[in-house]
């Protein structure tokens, strides 16, 4: 494998010319199919309309949507004009979206009507009341000075917002020469995507990724599984994470393969789509594969077309790995990394044993140096010696947006990114994650940062102290647990805490288990020992006869 210097838009043009009638995107459940040529034309129309809306190279386009067809359209349209797509988690509530819109300097926000109990329309009107009184194209928001447009992804009309249908019609009647001109100035090293990841400070940071970052990571991922133009990848993981928009999309676009999409995870839709489209590749976190295997209608579907896929996001039980191989005919691999590594650092291979794939994170990506260092001394660790996972290569982010201090904290002067994860390298060259220097919780593939939840809970006046940890869960990898001590004379119930969280922070961040304690285990220097809180939580649940789910 050699590295490529293409851009997202350039690769799309390549396949639209080389394989114009080859399917790029399929939504089996809504009978929607777009060839590379058709998709490229749609992208060009949206890109032209974005230029007309005043977007320039480097401007930020926010997208707050589940896996709807035009999610990918906006990604490629933004890329073609040199803009940066800022992905927004579909579970985010008002305060989280507000922070990202402001911090990212979003120029144009693209959104659907909502997701689950989350009404995006109400939230956006609440944040930007000017939408109801000002003309489209003349938005002047007091709260978001950089914001100039809001686009509704759909055909319904909302005051102050454009619709995708309107943008497509605009683009159809526009001269394409300005688009060609600006596209020719886009470099593979330009920023194309920005995703927010929380830090130990509790403040989310914008991870800036380039075309070069994500396309080479996607290409390597596809090569691990021997992708060709004949492959059909069923994607049910969210596009707003690197798993979806890099490991899936960029693996497809670098190999001329086909994306078979599901808007949001539903095991029945996944199985039906695999059956109908004869999908060859399937991605998911372990809980998704378990839900598919356990579905009562599983045996009604023919999934023998599957040959490989990725199971990532949290630790995979070896029993699940073996069932996926035997019952789904899917020789899955796993990928380890961070958003900051685009996200690939290491991966298992299809030739590895099920045990290796279930218990290790494999070997380094091509052209990526991986090493383990002693976090105290900075010296390289020997085989079998635990230390911090670090890497250097094309996969390293361009940095955190408007945060050079945090960038310098994670990328050292030699260009190595420090993951904060503890690991060991075995005698076969495979890496195994053994813990975290950071206290990040991974629940069902979602990264959760305790400090963010702790900061939010401290707003409850009854709380004196709160610490959030992850408790090992057989289903989700980890569950969120909160340990709370109350101020003298105050009372608070578990239900009070959950009610306070509900609707204000993303559902997956809400503590599943809440413990009220009088004092916290401390070190001699006065630091709280979170590992002892984890042990205490397990003891209290066992004593109460509660099994962690």
Stretch-by-stretch model annotation:
Residues 52-53, 81-169, 490:
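Structural core segment of the AMP-binding/adenylate-forming
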Residues 2-4, 24-76, 93-98, 166-172, ...:
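Conserved AMP-binding/adenylate-forming core of the ANL superfamily
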Residues 215-232, 240-281, 289-291, 295-297:
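Conserved AMP-binding/adenylation subdomain of ANL enzymes
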Residues 33-37, 183-185, 189-216:
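Conserved AMP-binding A3 loop
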Residues 92-102, 109-111, 282, 393, ...:
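AMP-binding/adenylate-forming catalytic core of the ANL superfamily
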Residues 168-169, 276-284, 293-356, 369:
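Gly/Ser/Thr-rich phosphate-binding loop
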Residues 20-23, 143-147, 151-158, 162-196, ...:
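Conserved pre-ATP/AMP-binding loop-to-beta segment of ANL
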Residues 11-35, 157-158:
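AMP-dependent adenylate-forming
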């Amino acid at each position: 494998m050699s590295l490529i210097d293409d851009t997202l838009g350039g690769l799309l043009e390549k396949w639209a010319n080389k394989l114009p009638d080859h399917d790029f995107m399929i939504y089996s459940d809504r009978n929607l199919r777009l060839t590379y040529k058709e998709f490229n034309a749609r992208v060009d129309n949206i890109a032209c309309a974005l230029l007309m809306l005043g977007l320039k190279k480097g401007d930020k386009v926010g997208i707050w949507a589940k896996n709807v067809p035009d999610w990918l359209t906006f990604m490629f349209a933004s890329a073609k004009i040199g803009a940066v797509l800022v992905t927004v988690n579909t579970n985010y509530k008002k305060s989280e979206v507000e922070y990202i819109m402001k911090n990212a300097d979003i120029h144009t926000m693209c959104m659907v009507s909502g997701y689950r109990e989350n009404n995006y329309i109400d939230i956006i009107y609440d944040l930007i009341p000017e939408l109801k009184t000002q003309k489209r194209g003349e938005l002047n928001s007091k709260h978001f000075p950089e914001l100039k447009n809001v686009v509704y992804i759909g055909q319904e009309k909302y005051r102050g917002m454009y619709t995708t249908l309107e943008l497509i019609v605009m683009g159809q009647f526009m001269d394409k020469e300005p688009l060609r001109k600006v596209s020719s100035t886009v470099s593979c090293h330009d920023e194309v995507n920005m995703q927010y990841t929380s830090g130990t400070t509790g403040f989310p940071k914008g991870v800036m990724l380039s075309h070069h970052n994500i396309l080479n990571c996607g290409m390597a991922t596809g090569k691990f599984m021997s992708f060709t133009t004949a492959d059909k990848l069923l994607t049910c993981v969210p596009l707003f994470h690197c798993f979806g928009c890099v490991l899936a999309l960029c693996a497809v676009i670098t190999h001329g393969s086909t994306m078979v999409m599901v808007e949001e995870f539903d095991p029945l839709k996944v199985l039906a789509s695999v059956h109908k489209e004869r999908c060859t590749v399937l991605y998911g976190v372990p809980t998704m594969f378990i839900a598919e295997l356990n579905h009562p209608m599983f045996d009604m579907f023919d999934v023998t077309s599957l040959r490989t896929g990725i199971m990532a996001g949290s630790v995979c039980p070896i029993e699940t790995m073996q069932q996926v191989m035997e019952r789904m005919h899917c020789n899955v691999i796993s990928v380890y990394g961070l958003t900051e590594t685009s996200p690939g650092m290491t991966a298992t291979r299809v030739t590895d044993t099920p045990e290796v794939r279930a218990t290790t994170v494999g070997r380094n990506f091509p052209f990526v140096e991986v090493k383990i260092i002693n976090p105290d001394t900075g010296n390289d660790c020997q085989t079998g010696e635990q230390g911090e996972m670090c890497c250097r290569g094309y996969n390293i982010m361009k940095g955190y947006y408007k945060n050079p201090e945090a960038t310098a904290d994670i990328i050292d002067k030699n260009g190595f990114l420090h993951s904060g994860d503890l690991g060991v390298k075995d005698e076969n060259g495979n890496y195994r994650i053994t813990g975290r220097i950071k206290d990040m919780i991974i629940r069902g593939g979602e990264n959760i940062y305790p400090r963010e939840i702790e900061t939010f809970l401290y707003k409850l006046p009854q709380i004196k102290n709160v610490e959030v940890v992850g408790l090992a869960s057989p289903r989700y990898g980890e569950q969120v647990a909160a340990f709370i001590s109350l101020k003298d004379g105050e009372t608070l119930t578990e239900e009070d805490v959950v009610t306070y969280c509900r609707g204000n922070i993303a559902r997956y961040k809400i503590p599943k288990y809440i413990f009220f304690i009088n004092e916290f285990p401390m070190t001699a220097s006065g630091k709280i020992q979170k590992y002892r809180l984890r042990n205490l939580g397990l003891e209290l649940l066992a004593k109460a006869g509660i099994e962690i789910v």
